[in-house]
Amino acid sequence: MHKLGIISFLFSCLFLFSCGTNKEKIVCYGDAKSNLAQLLTDEGYQLQFCSSVAEAIQKAPEQSPVLLLAPSYPEKGTVVTSEDLNLIQSKALRVFMDYPQQIGKNMCVKTDTMVLERVVVCDSLTPQLPAMSLMCFHRCILKEFDQAPDSTYLVAAKVAGFDNAVYGLANTPVHPLLYQQNNQLMVAATSVSNFATSRYLPEQRVQSMFEYIMNWLLQKQDVTFSSWPTYVSPSYSATEQLPKDAGKQSIAKGVEWYYNAHLLVHPSWKKDWADKYMGDGLAPVGPELPADMPDGDGSLGVLEGHMSSIYYDGKQQYRYWMRDDVQGESSYAFAAAGDLLGKQDYLKVSSNLLDYSFREYRDSVRNNPKSPSYGLLGWAYTHKGTYYGDDNARSILGSLAASSIMNSTSWDKQIVECIVGNFRTTGKNGFRGGNILDPDLQKNGWRHYFNSDLVNLHPHFESWNWACYLWLYEQTKYQPLLDRVKKGVSLMMAGYPNDWNWTNGIQQERARMILPLAWLYRVEPTDQHKQWLQFMTEELLKNQVACGGIREELGDESKSMFGCTPSNDAYGRTEASLIFKNGDPVA
């Protein structure tokens, strides 16, 4: 009898515990498999899905919560009729609906896709959602109505800023995104219920938004979520001890990314995908490749990669552009991974990429010994007559590293000819400038550039060519290579920081100086060269934070190519730094 009593007591405790974990019952309509439905179920809420909006509103007890979620986003919006509105009012329900097609007599008058717009918090909602803070609902599709809502919490607008709208909502169109239609009805103008699939960011703010919505829906003040669904997360936490082979694992994952993303061009899809979307190179953007597409072996090159643009369903756009610097850099990645991991397939891809690079981007006048363009590598498949020194240098640095790892001399001639081609278009002071166009080079001849007095205090464009020149000097002891680099580096260091030009951030410019300074000390180890290297390294590391990342920094705005975005209207028109002001946490 004593045992039966204990068992009965344990079952009672288990029953009470299970009851305690079940939270409010919520009547719902829409996609029962959505991220929001799954989250609420995992959190212990009891969701009762109905087959129609009318059924959900009719079945909901008075003063209870109702969720009306988009049944098929983006094809079909949610419809609430006038009868539904009347019943919501009479029963004093709290209703949240997303992606509305109709609200009473008001019909959606416009369906629009956000492109450059971000989500702006109008007034402070939570500590994580202060006024003017930003979220990204990537290319979400908005439903707009003529009738103004009672209260607007979030709007979609094209605004400048890193994590807040620094210029406010002035001089930019705004579109209500989360608002209260009346006391009983809160509306999201897009579908927010698949927030994880759609990769809405940042996650902490999206979570806080839903906690705010749920507190309103349940008429509470303490709703929080114990977990949060995500499809992208770090491999390790900030405090987790790394395994001994963490570096090796990261390299293995890094090179497999090329295959997971299908970046190696395959002959079966080259014409219908790579060539089609590359076009003339001005907007070489298209949808991601289907998951079942085969991967190439490097003999047709590697795509530039992903765009930052994400579609409403979480898929990401591709840059179907074929750039030569990508070929050289990727060949290095495959060679390093192949050597470390013992993967002959990776080494073969590396070799094929180098063959492709020198075959495809050194054609025509670039392969004619009598041409002033001889040895140079074209910037891209669509812009072979544009010669950026920094792009040539990136390709050559990758080629040098890959060929060294593979212990191959197959590309030595092309590598040296490319370095010389760049050097003979470098002026007396050691500077080459941004880019040289082939028509100008054919007209002027290479001596025009070799004898110029150009000074260009812009490491982005100059520094890695210097590293290439110094590498060639070490092999040949050809004195003009060293002399021109020393002249250029001396002027560059003397002009730091006030006279430096910068592209997307001053930290990137500092970082680019490390390699040529290291090579300069290697080939001529003087106290001055050592001091320069130490100084620039210390300048770079001033912004290193506890996790090891080196924070980006903006320089003198008057010296920038793409600096701080000056207005809401200017946002998204050009390249820009990832940060808006110094201190923004971006490495």
Q: Where are these predicted regions, by residue range?
A:
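Catalytic beta-strand/loop cores that center a nucleophilic Ser/Cys/Thr
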Residues: R118-S191, F195-S198
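Carbohydrate-active enzymes and regulators
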Residues: A32-K33, D42-Y45, A60-P61, P65-V66, ...
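Helical hinge/lid and interdomain linker segments adjacent to catalytic or ligand-binding clefts
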Residues: K25-M107
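A glycine-rich, often tryptophan-bearing local segment used as a flexible ligand/cofactor-contacting loop or short
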Residues: Y73-S151
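Glycine-centered loop/turn motifs
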Residues: E62-S64, S151, V365, G548
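Extracellular ligand-binding/catalytic regions of CAZymes and related secreted enzymes
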Residues: F96, V166-K253
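Glycan-recognition and catalytic cores of secretory/periplasmic carbohydrate-active enzymes
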Residues: W216-A587
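Bacterial Sec-dependent N-terminal signal peptides
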Residues: M1-E24
